[in-house]
């Protein structure tokens, strides 16, 4: 009997065992069975788990805010980029948060990092440790929505980490005169005490201002202050701190370790005698605030302050911090941590990594009064730390030279808000180790004496002006913890930033110079910012290739003026006509597209408009063009004009536009709606003969360049472009919007619907949804007409997409929908992004990057994961019993490394230098054309197959489903582990990669065996090719 071809074979049926099927009846399964099922598939922590995960010597990143590229892009695209954004008002260092998030969403990670470091020299550190819920995130407008606020800290960390991986040094402000031509004031000697966040920030800004003799004196043999010694490695790695210090040193700042502010070493008086013109004190609060009940207790007895414990942990876990490797403190048994701030929680989670069996966090007040950020508390809770509120320490019990317990009394708050201690309610807790985290003070008399003659306040701290950070001694400034204003790293950074300007102002005054009334601190610069992105086209010099399309952003010339002020290189006017052809628009007329699905707000992938050309007169536009060219001679202004098929009309309007001073003309022969009914726009642009003649008329009328704007609503756009060239056009714009009907409501009415009758017409679709159409138009024109100038438009919303059009053969880039999604300031992102993309092409070490995206490492939740198959010849997913196995294997490996005294190697910063010339815009135009051709030119011998990275796989089975119901049934899906496996029947179609939610979890690799198609029925004749 002949086999039934339309039924799956037995082996395929086996593969399809877990493939979704439509439900025909309710499913029955007992509660007890479902409880077992739940345990098998569980990914989050089990509430009934009493065994703490072994964390000894595990200093891997534990932050919930950490993001990989996939997560960062999704989060950045979710951001609204609000007007007058509240998040920015809540940031101590005044970061332009919405702008750096815009850059991340556009995959311009350098642009984001530049924006961050410009206002915060410790931008990576702050991205990791900032208490964002109390700061920027607390003001996020998305708190008013179901999905909640943006993970700003995670985005900041991601962008700055990518820049760190670029290994590009900071450079001196390029707008400053050469050092030898700077005034004498900039050679003034400046001293800073303490190499912590406040001093690093202050020194960085002073160096950016141009000061060349800046020295930081640090008491310890390591740098970074509390960022190094007290914030644990799993929250802030040492190589991050070192990276930011190296950025500062790129500007010539010197650091001398082993020198402290003390009467025994250096004082303000001796500093002044040595010729220092200004000093900044940023030494923090070096001594612990120790309760009287702990006097006389030692580490050997099991007592630590946070100032003792955390530096010991840091030295044992932070590779590169010290010259020699130090062991972690050995903590065993039960630990009591006293305090409820971030430091207390750092002590608790660090104790677990030093071997503690159980950790109790004890504090005087209730949960609602905990000062630590919620993330820190949540992490401690997840690691099974216990919380004991309303307890005040009374006595430490010592037996046999070791701490064995502590006594506490209960605290209560009365109706007036006052806290009282109830001696009748005693609590006795057994413990082996006690860690006090009750804050820090400045109590060393030698340090205070060294600060003489500055005044101190009633808290024993230097008295400063909170605006200028100036002490009672005009030449001495202070900031950070030591002055008591800053409570966080980011606030310390801002203290140093604030002080830098007023130090600058003070020094200049000492040399008889003045500074601007409004502070103007320089931005962060690298060699990327020096890249030239100007380009010439049709004899015109464009300062950058980005301009306004003839559309809504150019509705008026005052808008064009604002665009030029923002940095746009050129602009087209909105299309205008002779007065006899003037139009009046309908409303509504511009609507969001349906191509983004139910995603509302910015970032729309398409818009549809039924807007006609400008309602303003030709006289308005011509006078305005004259004004713009007078005020912006370096910017290109292109007048966009439209007439019916009438030689006299085209001649008249073209001459008027040329006489106005326009640099060039764009002939709108492609408006897809409305104007065609008047014999204009599309009515002319779809016929090569009409296009050729109109171009000839305009060529006869004017001397300036002109470009024909092409419509994609034709069968062969090249024939239209060729006709324009034959008619004398200097180039073409490709393309205008695509004619379409965006959507219908459930009652059959369209949107937009005009008037009571709710009628509509086909409109023009714009945005990233039409980018594939625009890319085809540009490449096909560039291939057919080599060297013929092309102005690209259609879905350009970033430097990355702009580069695609340059590679396709365009010379300049017109933007509309991206501005509708945001505002004119996106130009800054586009320019820095394009400069970075060009610069990175010259770095040999980064050739495996895709633009600004680093090569993907195996990760889960944005964090690198150890390859279990390398530690144990076994593949394990990350859920249920397999997750527990993974944790056990990792824990055993961490302990093995500790026992073998294997320390992680310190990361050394090696700056990458270009090995080849940085390409110009001209160099990259048309680069992609060599790869385009006919299907017949493609190889059907060089085949690929899919390869899955099991460590990155989240076991969703999307690859399995699409292969089953849209492909070749070439993926097996394990019923227990949900790990997919590619079979040898894979044809390399790439559908699996296309639907996979994890970037680079699936890759296509070369097929090692010949590809033999499954024909179903044997061929009856030999194929001809």
Swiss-Prot record:
Alphabetized SUPFAM superfamilies for the sequence: 4Fe-4S ferredoxins, alpha-helical ferredoxin, FMN-linked oxidoreductases, Nucleotide-binding domain
Which positions are annotated as binding substrate? 609, 668-670, 736-737
Q: Which PROSITE patterns match?
A: 4FE4S_FER_1, 4FE4S_FER_2
Catalytic residues identified in the record: 671 (proton acceptor)
What does the cofactor section's free text say about binding?
Binds 2 FAD. Binds 2 FMN.
Lineage, opening ranks? Eukaryota, Metazoa, Chordata, Craniata, Vertebrata
Family the UniProt entry places it in: Belongs to the dihydropyrimidine dehydrogenase family.
The yes or no answer to whether the keyword Flavoprotein is present is yes
Self-association state and partner proteins as the record states: Homodimer.
Residues holding FMN: 550, 574-575, 709, 767, 793-795, 816-817
State one molecular function term (GO): dihydropyrimidine dehydrogenase (NADP+) activity
Q: Summarize the activity regulation.
A: Inactivated by 5-iodouracil.
Gene3D superfamilies, from UniProt?
3.30.70.20, Aldolase class I, Alpha-helical ferredoxin, FAD/NAD(P)-binding domain
Q: Which InterPro entries match?
A: 4Fe4S_Fe-S-bd, 4Fe4S_Fe_S_CS, Aldolase_TIM, Dihydroorotate_DH_cat, DPD_II, FAD/NAD-bd_sf, FAD/NAD-binding_dom, Helical_ferredxn
Q: Where in the cell is it found?
A: Cytoplasm
What does the entry list as the binding residues for [4Fe-4S] cluster 1? 79, 82, 87, 140
User: What EC numbers are recorded for this enzyme?
Assistant: 1.3.1.2
What organism does the record attribute this protein to? Pongo abelii (Sumatran orangutan)
Q: Name one GO biological process term.
A: uracil catabolic process
Task: Give the sites modified to N6-acetyllysine.
Answer: 384
- The molecule here is called Dihydropyrimidine dehydrogenase [NADP(+)]
Where along this sequence does the record place binding of [4Fe-4S] cluster 3?
A: 953, 956, 959, 963
Q: Where is the 4Fe-4S ferredoxin-type domain?
A: 69-100, 944-976, 978-1007
């Amino acid at each position: 009997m002949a086999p039934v071809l339309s039924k799956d074979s037995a082996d395929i049926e086996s593969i399809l065992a877990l493939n979704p099927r439509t439900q025909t009846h309710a499913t029955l399964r007992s509660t007890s069975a479902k409880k077992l099922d739940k345990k098998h598939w569980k990914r989050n922590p089990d509430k009934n788990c009493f065994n703490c995960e072994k964390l000894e010597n595990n200093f891997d990143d534990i932050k919930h805010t950490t993001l990989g590229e996939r997560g960062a892009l999704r989060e950045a695209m979710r951001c609204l980029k609000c007007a007058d954004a509240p998040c920015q008002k809540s940031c101590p260092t005044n970061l332009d948060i919405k702008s750096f998030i815009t850059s991340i969403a556009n995959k311009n990670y350098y642009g984001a990092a530049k924006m961050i470091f410009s206002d915060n020299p410790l931008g990576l550190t702050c991205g990791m440790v900032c208490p964002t819920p109390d700061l920027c995130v607390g003001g996020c407008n998305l708190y008013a929505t179901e999905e909640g606020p943006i993970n700003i800290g995670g985005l900041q960390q991601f962008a700055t980490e990518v820049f760190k991986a670029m290994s590009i040094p900071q450079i001196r402000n390029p707008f400053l005169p050469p050092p030898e031509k700077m005034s004498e004031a900039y050679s003034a000697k400046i001293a800073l005490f303490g190499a912590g966040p406040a001093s690093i920030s202050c020194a960085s800004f002073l160096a950016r201002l141009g000061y060349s003799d800046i020295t930081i004196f640090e008491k310890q043999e390591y740098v970074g202050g509390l960022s190094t010694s007290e914030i644990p490695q799993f929250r802030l790695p040492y190589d991050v701190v070192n990276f930011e210090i190296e950025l500062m040193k790129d500007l010539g700042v010197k650091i001398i370790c082993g020198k402290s502010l003390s009467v025994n070493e250096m004082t303000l008086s001796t500093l002044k005698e040595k010729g220092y013109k200004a000093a900044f004190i940023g030494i923090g609060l070096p001594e612990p605030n120790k309760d009287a009940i702990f006097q006389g207790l030692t580490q050997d007895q099991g007592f630590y302050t946070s100032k003792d414990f955390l530096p010991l942990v840091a030295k044992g876990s932070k590779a590169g911090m010290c010259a020699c490797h130090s062991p972690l403190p050995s903590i065993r048994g039960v630990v009591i941590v006293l305090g409820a701030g971030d430091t207390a929680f750092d002590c608790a989670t660090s104790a677990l990594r030093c071997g503690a069996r159980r950790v109790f966090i004890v504090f005087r007040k209730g949960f609602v009064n905990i000062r630590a950020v919620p993330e820190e508390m949540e992490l401690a809770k997840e690691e099974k730390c216990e919380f004991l509120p309303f307890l005040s320490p009374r006595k430490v019990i010592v037996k046999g030279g070791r701490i064995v317990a502590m006594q506490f009394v209960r605290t209560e708050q009365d109706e007036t808000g006052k806290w009282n201690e109830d001696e009748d309610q005693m609590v006795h807790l057994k413990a082996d180790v006690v860690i006090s985290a009750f804050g820090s003070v400045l109590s060393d008399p030698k340090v205070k004496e060294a600060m003489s003659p500055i005044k101190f306040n009633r808290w024993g701290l230097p008295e400063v002006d909170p605006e200028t950070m100036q002490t009672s001694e005009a030449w001495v400034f202070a900031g950070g913890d030591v002055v008591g204003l800053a409570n966080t790293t980011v606030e310390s950074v801002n203290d140093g930033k604030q002080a830098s300007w007023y130090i600058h102002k003070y020094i200049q005054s000492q040399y008889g110079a003045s500074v601007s009334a409004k502070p103007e601190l320089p931005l962060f610069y690298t060699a990327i910012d020096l890249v030239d992105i100007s380009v010439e086209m049709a004899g015109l010099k464009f300062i950058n290739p980005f301009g306004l399309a003839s559309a809504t952003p150019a509705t008026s010339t005052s808008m064009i003026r604002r665009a030029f002020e923002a940095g746009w290189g050129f602009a087209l006017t909105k299309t205008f006509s002779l007065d006899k052809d003037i139009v009046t628009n309908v409303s509504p007329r511009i609507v969001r597209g349906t191509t983004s699905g139910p995603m509302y707000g910015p970032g729309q992938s398409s818009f549809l408009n039924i807007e006609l050309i400008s309602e303003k007169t030709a006289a308005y536009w011509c006078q305005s063009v004259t004004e713009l060219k007078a005020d912006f001679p370096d910017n290109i202004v292109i007048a966009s004009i439209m007439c019916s098929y009438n030689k006299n009309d085209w001649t008249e309007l073209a001459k008027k536009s040329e006489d106005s001073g326009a640099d060039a003309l764009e002939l709108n022969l492609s408006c897809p709606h409305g104007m065609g009914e008047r014999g204009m726009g599309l009515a002319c642009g779809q016929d090569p003969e009409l296009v050729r003649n109109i171009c000839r008329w305009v060529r006869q009328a004017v001397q300036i360049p002109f470009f024909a704007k092409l419509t994609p609503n034709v069968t062969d756009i090249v024939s239209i472009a060729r006709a324009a060239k034959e008619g004398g056009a200097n180039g073409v714009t490709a393309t205008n919007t695509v004619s379409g009907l965006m959507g219908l409501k459930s009652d059959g009415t369209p949107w937009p619907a005009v008037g009571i009758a709710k009628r509509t017409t086909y409109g023009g679709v714009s945005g990233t949804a039409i980018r594939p159409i625009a890319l085809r138009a540009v490449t096909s024109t560039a291939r057919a007409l080599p060297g013929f100038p092309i102005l690209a438009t259609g879905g350009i919303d970033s430097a990355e997409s702009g580069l695609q059009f340059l590679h396709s053969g365009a010379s300049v880039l017109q933007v509309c929908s991206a501005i509708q999604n945001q505002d004119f300031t996106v130009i800054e992102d586009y320019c820095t992004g394009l400069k970075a993309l060009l610069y990175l092409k010259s770095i040999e070490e980064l050739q495996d990057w895709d633009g600004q995206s680093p090569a993907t490492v195996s990760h889960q939740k944005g964090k690198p994961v150890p390859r279990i198959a390398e530690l144990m010849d076994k593949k394990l997913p990350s859920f249920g019993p397999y997750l527990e196995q993974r944790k056990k294997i990792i824990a055993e490996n961490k302990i093995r490394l500790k026992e073998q005294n294997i320390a992680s190697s310190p990361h050394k910063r090696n700056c990458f230098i270009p090995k080849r010339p940085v390409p110009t815009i001209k160099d990259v135009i048309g680069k992609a054309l060599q790869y385009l051709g006919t299907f017949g030119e493609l190889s059907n011998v060089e085949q690929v197959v899919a390869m899955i990275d099991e460590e990155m796989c989240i076991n969703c089975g999307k690859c399995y489903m699409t292969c089953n119901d849209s492909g070749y049934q070439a993926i097996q899906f394990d019923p227990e582990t949900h790990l997919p496996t590619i079979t040898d029947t894979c044809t390399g179609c790439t559908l699996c990669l296309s639907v996979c939610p994890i970037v680079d979890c699936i890759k296509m690799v070369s097929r090692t065996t010949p590809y033999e198609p499954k024909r179903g029925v044997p061929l009856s004749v030999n194929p001809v090719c």
